[in-house]
């Protein structure tokens, strides 16, 4: 109870498919279905990884058809160098109702994130590569994200993560802690259970 007087009893978890390990949509789909059978409540894919825009749309459609519309489908664009890709892809995949649109551009490009958020109407996720509280304050002030995913190992630990969480809650922004390694997973899991947003 050091972090919260009302910790959650359970949290939802999603599976990262690591799309680069799946050479085609069929293999990726099989992985997604397998992960769902393991009990994960959502699936994250990287539709632009080694794919054109039209192929990315086919990928999203294929996975959505396999997992259904009740299961959250997260899209990670992995910060493409070409900022126009996020805007070009959005109308192609909107009908598949992605739960979020992660790293449509580099997280340092706060104005671009805010613009993409407005233009696409999709829930923007950013923050995994950023590490200072002032950056997150700037993202929040610009209304550039719906969900922040700071990495507990990158932002300075539990205290700074808690500060980012509190700042986000005041703006109605959700937190989905990012994890690089097992120690981060353990610390992030503790945060998940203790934060309200």
Model-derived features with residue positions:
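Flexible, active-site-adjacent loop/turn segments at secondary-structure boundaries
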Residues: 1, 5, 103, 156
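N-terminal capping/lid subdomain adjacent to the active-site entrance of alpha/beta enzymes
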Residues: 1-73, 78-80, 87, 91-95, ...
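Active-site beta-loop-alpha junctions enriched in small/polar residues
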Residues: 16-20, 46-50, 72, 76-82, ...
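Residues at alpha-helix caps and immediate loop-helix transition turns in enzyme cores, especially N-
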Residues: 27, 55-59, 85-86, 112, ...
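Shared catalytic-loop signature of beta/alpha-barrel
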Residues: 91, 97, 108-125, 130-197
